A protein has these predicted regions:
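Mobile gating loops/cap/lid regions near enzyme active sites that modulate substrate access
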Residues: 189, 194-207, 211, 218-222, ...
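Secretion/assembly modules of Gram-negative surface proteins
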Residues: 26-28, 45, 78-86, 115-124, ...
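A structural motif corresponding to the C-terminal end of an alpha-helix
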Residues: 74, 78-79, 123, 169-183, ...
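Structural recognition of the beta-strand scaffold that forms the well-ordered cores
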Residues: 32-47, 71-74, 90-96, 128-134, ...
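Extracellular/periplasmic catalytic domains that process cell-envelope and extracellular macromolecules
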Residues: 27-29, 84-88, 121-126, 130, ...
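Gram-negative bacterial Sec-dependent N-terminal signal peptides
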Residues: 1-27
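Outer-membrane beta-barrel translocator domains and adjoining extracellular loop/strand segments
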Residues: 143-146, 196-199, 351-355
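Conserved SGNH/GDSL esterase-like catalytic core that processes O-acyl groups on lipids
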Residues: 56-165, 313-317
């Protein structure tokens, strides 16, 4: 039966619930990782393609759009870059900084990333884990014109709709091709990113991001119902960011509003910042994102133990963030997820390519 897992910020996690569900967990296993996306997932593809020109490294870390590895490099696989002639039988990363969700030529849009993978002989298996994350660059590039129009929200709406449609096309195509598990990230709060925070563009950026997330979710629910052989996991990065911003100290952070790297100088304590630059997380931020992603990927079936109202199950438990030194005070912000099955239905104003 198809499973659609959606992170959700449910209130009041209790230790009793955590213990009850933790004992019922059964770990998931995957044979390899295939990645499609933009700078949040890029492990150095754009850097290699531009001859080391973008992003500037250092201060960026070895071609990543951060000061350390991207979260996709922390999911238990050593995925290779998508250079010409690269093997597509093992783990591989096709994400490019600056990529849109469409068929843009360069950086390769995500539709083109998928075409490049399948064109090289790449296939999808029931044991594969596929990560898909994108949409922000479409919005970044659409904001200037939309902001200058008489109806900014109306002008940005087609950009948002097209990006969400691209994402859902990718998910549906990959599921139809046989992928067992697809991790689909939505986009974080754009209005609260340093690039937009406090600017006149912030409200429109936030509107665009949240509208995209809503459209993405609606499409994924339809796709999950139509693709019973694939587990589709919506990784709610928006709510991850909200949890970190609401209680930064619980996660070892002291600054969740400013960029550590301002384009000239790097802050003294990058590991205490959430943002590396105007829109990208620090290595510490990527590590926190990866910890929660791993929790859902490897223990994502816990919700099945608690069915509530027809085909909906709610999961309340402690996420394994390995933050014991921080105590329990902030962990509830990470907790919970909503697990949906479909038996009842079916039986920021620049691209990240330049390093900001």
């Amino acid at each position: 039966m198809s499973r659609f897992l959606r992170n959700a910020a449910l209130a009041a996690l209790t230790m009793a619930a955590a213990g009850a569900f933790a004992s019922a967990a059964s770990a998931q296993t995957y044979s390899r990782l295939v990645v499609f996306g933009d700078s949040l997932s890029d492990n150095g593809n754009l850097f290699a393609a531009t001859g080391g020109a973008s992003p500037t490294s250092p201060p960026y870390f070895q071609g990543r759009f951060s000061n350390g590895p991207a979260f996709t490099e922390l999911l238990g696989f050593n995925a290779g870059r998508s250079a010409a002639g690269a093997s597509v039988t093992g783990s591989i990363n096709y994400a490019y900084g600056g990529a849109r969700t469409d068929s843009s030529a360069f950086p390769p849009g995500m539709r083109n990333q998928l075409l490049a993978y399948t064109g090289a002989g790449g296939t999808f298996r029931s044991t594969d884990l596929v990560s898909i994350l994108g949409g922000a660059n479409n919005i970044f590039q659409g904001l200037p014109a939309a902001g200058a129009s008489p109806n900014p929200t109306g002008a940005i709406a087609p950009v948002v709709s097209a990006a969400a449609a691209d994402m859902n096309f990718l998910v549906n195509s990959i599921a139809a091709a046989g992928a067992g598990t697809i991790l689909v990230g939505n986009i974080p709060s754009l209005g609260n990113a340093p690039q937009f925070r406090g600017t006149v563009a912030a409200p429109l950026a936030e509107f665009a991001g949240t509208s995209f997330n809503s459209a993405l979710l609606a499409g994924l629910m339809t796709t999950a119902a139509a693709r019973p052989g694939t587990n589709i996991i919506l990784f709610d990065i928006y709510k991850v960011g909200a949890a970190l911003t609401a209680n930064p100290g619980a996660f070892g952070l002291t600054n969740v509003t400013d960029a550590c790297f301002n384009g000239i100088t790097v802050c003294a304590t990058p590991n205490t910042y959430l943002f590396w630059d105007g829109v990208h997380p620090t290595a510490a931020g990527h590590q926190l994102i990866a910890r929660l992603a791993n929790d859902y990927l490897y223990y994502g079936d816990i919700g099945a133990q608690s069915t509530v109202q027809a085909e909906t199950a709610f999961r309340q438990r402690e996420d394994l963030l390995d933050l014991a030194s921080e105590g329990m005070s902030g962990r509830a912000d990470w907790q919970a997820g909503t697990h949906l099955t479909f038996g009842a239905i079916a039986d920021s104003v620049e691209t990240d390519a330049r390093g900001s």
